[in-house]
Amino acid sequence: MKNRLFDMLIYGFLLMFALICVLPFIHVIAASFATVEEVVSKKFILIPTTFSLDAYRYIFSTDIIYKSLLVSVFVTVIGTAVSMFLSSLMAYGLSRRDLIGRQPLMFLVVFTMLFSGGMIPTFLVVKSLGLLDSYWALILPTAINAFNLIILKNFFQNIPSSLEESAKIDGCNDLGIFFKIVLPLSLPAIATISLFYAVTYWNTYMTAILYLNDSAKWPIQVLLRQIVIVSSGMQGDMSEMGSGSPPPEQTIKMAVIVVATIPVLLVYPFIQKHFAKGALLGSVKG
């Protein structure tokens, strides 16, 4: 009886915590579809009484946003592929106990987690490499994340060495072992870290502001910020972007949040199984 009561209390607490996490996002979605009067009169909306697409029409009324979506998709796909390729190769090398200089290299990796190069030095390096106003400026400076690298390294390190020894007996070299044995066995970790990198690239904001001067190359996050600024009357007017009078600023902000968040949420269910397993194994074996 006591155990059942305890379980009910735990489930009740978890349900309440889940509602606290989910309700704000439901409010954001509902408010983005609500009418002007409802947004102004109500503080919290779960289901709009009258659906309105004015905010979304306003956001998608210009071709610029479609270009920005393509830019974000390109940066996310290419950036994730580059980051996973470089991170997995480096993590595999650091996971080998026979690697000469392994400890000093690991120290340098951990050091970058505590002390970064700084905004201005990084900008000067990007400028000297001729990457300003280039999509690669959004990818290469952050291609390897030290935290993600350590997770992959710990995962690779726990793969039984007997598998590698058997592969070597069969004539497999190091690259063959990596691509044919290590990577297939590491799909949960690969899926987890890929999602981490993809979310980071999709939310690219500060680096785009620093390195991109051409508005035609803006990713979706920067353009949505500009739409919010224009709609609130802080600078310019929307006629320059090919749109008429805007709906209320509150609904535009809510619609912007939905547009920026939904793509990531659509990807997550397809890798949920691998993501949960990879996160669990990383926490136990790390």
Swiss-Prot record:
GO biological process per UniProt: transmembrane transport
Give me the Gene Ontology terms describing cellular component. Answer: plasma membrane
Q: Which family does it belong to?
A: Belongs to the binding-protein-dependent transport system permease family. CysTW subfamily.
Task: Check the record and name the SUPFAM superfamilies matching this protein.
Answer: MetI-like (SSF161098)
Q: ABC transmembrane type-1 domain: from which residue to which, for each copy?
A: 69-271
Record keywords, A-Z: Cell membrane, Membrane, Sugar transport, Transmembrane, Transmembrane helix, Transport
- From which residue to which does the signal peptide run? none
> InterPro entries, from UniProt?
MetI-like (IPR000515), MetI-like_sf (IPR035906)
- Compartments, record wording: Cell membrane
Give the matching PANTHER family: ABC TRANSPORTER PERMEASE PROTEIN MG189-RELATED-RELATED, POLYGALACTURONAN_RHAMNOGALACTURONAN TRANSPORT SYSTEM PERMEASE PROTEIN YTCP
UniProt name for this protein: Polygalacturonan/rhamnogalacturonan transport system permease protein YtcP
Its main localization is membrane
Quaternary context: The complex is probably composed of two ATP-binding proteins (MsmX), two transmembrane proteins (YtcP and YteP) and a solute-binding protein (YtcQ).
The record's gene field reads ytcP
Q: Which residues cross the membrane?
A: 9-29, 69-89, 106-126, 131-151, 176-196, 251-271
Topology relative to the membrane, per the entry? Multi-pass membrane protein
Which purpose does this protein serve, as stated in its record? Involved in pectin degradation. Part of the ABC transporter complex YtcQP-YteP involved in the uptake of polygalacturonan and rhamnogalacturonan type I. Responsible for the translocation of the substrate across the membrane.
